[in-house]
């Protein structure tokens, strides 16, 4: 026998503001007959892999690598509050194409551009120079961590638009997403800061 009000009492808080909705919250909403709640819309992320060596094929020659970073970030979209759009692969000579993609992003509903690779100091690492050609309100490149040292972050002046340049190495890219991109997404949503481990 369950008595009326044994799950929740009248006026009791069900979910705090700035909480990521989880299945247990949906269970509570349905049990209480709550049909509508106010939520913030997901942010939109546009992702580019970079480099002549990147391949979407499963069978790759020795000098190429599989496009794993694209699939990793794509499959985080349900957990990390964003819509993922694959922008494709920017090859080593695609500086102008990348610049045009950023220009289009400024007029679109894209909130964040993420690139993977081409952020270090190599001959074909064009991402930093292209990004710095725009007017920026915030910018940093390289941090004292491993893996992930060559990460880049930029915010376009006068716009709520950001660009992250992640390293091409899969482990470095995953680490930088977790410790830089994800906290930025939390900041956008006004979520509480994570507690240290």
Regions found by a protein language model. Give the residues of each.
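Short, glycine/charged-enriched hinge/interface segments at domain edges or termini
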Residues: 1-87
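Flexible glycine/proline-rich
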Residues: 8, 130-197
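Short beta-strand segments
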Residues: 16, 47-50, 115-116, 144, ...
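Short glycine/serine/threonine-rich phosphate/pyrophosphate-binding segments
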Residues: 23-24, 56-57, 121-125, 174
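Short glycine-rich anion-binding loops that position phosphate/pyrophosphate groups of nucleotides
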Residues: 52-53, 118-124, 168-170
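A general structural motif
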Residues: 64-69, 91-98, 142-151
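N-terminal small/polar loop signature for handling phosphorylated ligands or for N-terminal nucleophile
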Residues: 71-135
């Amino acid at each position: 026998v369950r008595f009326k009000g044994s799950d929740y009492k009248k006026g009791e808080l069900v979910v705090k503001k700035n909480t990521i909705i989880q299945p247990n919250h949906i269970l509570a909403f349905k049990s209480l007959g709550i049909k509508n709640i106010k939520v913030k819309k997901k942010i939109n992320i546009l992702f580019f892999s970079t480099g002549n060596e990147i391949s979407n094929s499963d069978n790759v020659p020795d000098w190429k690598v599989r496009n794993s970073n694209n699939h990793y970030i794509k499959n985080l979209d349900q957990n990390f509050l964003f819509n993922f759009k694959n922008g494709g692969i920017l090859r080593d000579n695609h500086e102008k194409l990348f610049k045009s993609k950023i220009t289009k992003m400024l007029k679109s509903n894209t909130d964040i551009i993420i690139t993977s690779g081409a952020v270090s100091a190599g001959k074909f690492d064009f991402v930093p120079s292209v990004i710095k050609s725009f007017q920026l309100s915030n910018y940093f490149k390289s941090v004292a961590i491993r893996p992930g040292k060559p990460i880049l972050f930029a915010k376009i002046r006068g716009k709520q638009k950001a660009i992250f340049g992640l390293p091409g190495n899969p482990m470095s890219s995953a680490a930088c997403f977790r410790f830089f991109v994800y906290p930025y997404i939390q900041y956008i949503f006004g979520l509480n800061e994570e507690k240290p481990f």
